[in-house]
Amino acid sequence: MIGSFPELCPFPKTCRMHVLFVHKNFPAQFGHLAARLVKQRGYRCSFLSEKGPALVQGVEVIPYQVRGGATAATHFCSRTFENTVWHSAALYETLKARPDIRPDLVVGHAGFSSTVFLRELYDCPFINYFEYFYRSRDSDLDFRPEFPAGEWQRLRAWTRNASLLVDLESCEAGYSPTRWQRDLLPEVFRPKVEVIFDGIDTSVWNRVAQPGRTFGTFQIPPDCRLLTYVSRGFESMRGFDIFMKVAKRLCDQHPNLVVAVVGEDRICYGGDAEHIGGPSFRQWVLSQEQYDLSRILFLGRLDPPDLARLLSLSDLHIYLTVPFVLSWSLMNALACGATILASDTAPVREMITPGQNGLLAGFFDVDGFVAQANEVLQRPHDYRHLAENGRKMIHEHYSLDVCLSRMERLYERVGSLPRPVPPLSAPTGAEPAG
């Protein structure tokens, strides 16, 4: 934790500290911060990713190429680790060929790859971002008994953490977006892992004042109520099937209700395809009951400004998730001042306090969702204080400016720590087999 580091003077704005970010994707969680450090702090920032090369807002994006990975012959339980090693080797080989890259601090996402090989190149401190520590029980794998994880999926959960454990042991410090995510980590490592959220860009995600209630070519009549649901993919882990049951009953009870569903017809997480006999969980759900698709509108994927406008029009936004990484869509909806009714699951409870900044219902409690939704839809103005409190929470505690300032302080403190043991010389000779 930051409090455990010595109180050293932070780097002055004139100092060109060099930070190397490592993530499979760009910009991912680090892009906003890298651009800010370049512009406001005068830092040099490099970003190692599978995308590129490019110079984006002063940040050099360096591409790396993975030369191998797990195959059908690789044991199912070790494929994640095998892929991670190949990614980590590609990071090492790419930077070994760039002697001009001499960072003062390395910041990497622990998951797609490990930064531990880079310790053989650099003697600077390392910070890792820890997003999710897998567990076989009391987790996303066994939360939905109607869609049970297979035996080997449960066994694999233990080995999927292998590279995370390496990074937890080797890094000088780390951070996780929420307390719930941090507390999934083994207790022995938690003291050196801060809780710092990724940050919501409130210049985009904010309540948009609009004349009338028009979205695109769709005009929402004054006496209509608008219910919204957003998910990157339509799947059981985000409760799409539960939401559709709730939406159907609400449509039956409210002739003036319109439902807007945002997302793509794909499965991003979990093993839904194995249980439904096909790739489309949406089609499987729609085949279970009769839905009025003239009132339940599937809008596809929306650009952030359009989605912010839609959320600003919403009378009620429903969000569900199993115990898993919290969706940014919940935070975006809060930032836009939508009244939230969400599943009473651990990651959600960290953000939503019932009666203060939203409402909660049991994940499987369709009756509970319908009852509370009815109350909001009948008297939406009576619940506007919840929406306003949620909006203030995001702006005061989870906005990009607030979160990036916390990250800057962490980076400066860790970057000021004494250097670790100097690295070995970059090995030469035969390359690894594979």
Q: What does each model-identified segment do?
A:
Residues 339-342:
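Short hydrophobic beta-strand element within catalytic cores of glycosyltransferases
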Residues 368, 375, 382-397, 403-409:
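A short, well-ordered alpha-helix in the C-terminal region of glycosyltransferases
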Residues 354-355, 359-366, 375-380:
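Conserved acidic donor-binding segment of nucleotide-sugar-dependent glycosyltransferases
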Residues 216-238, 244-249, 259-260:
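Conserved donor-binding/catalytic core segment of Leloir-type glycosyltransferases
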Residues 322:
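Aromatic "clamp/platform" in nucleotide-sugar-dependent glycosyltransferases that forms part
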Residues 68-77, 124-162, 203, 207-208, ...:
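Acceptor-binding helix/loop patch of EC 2.4 sugar-transfer enzymes
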Residues 267, 273-301, 305:
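Nucleotide-activated donor-binding/catalytic signature segment of Leloir-type glycosyltransferases, i.e.
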Residues 9-60, 65, 418, 424, ...:
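N-terminal subdomain of nucleotide-sugar transferases
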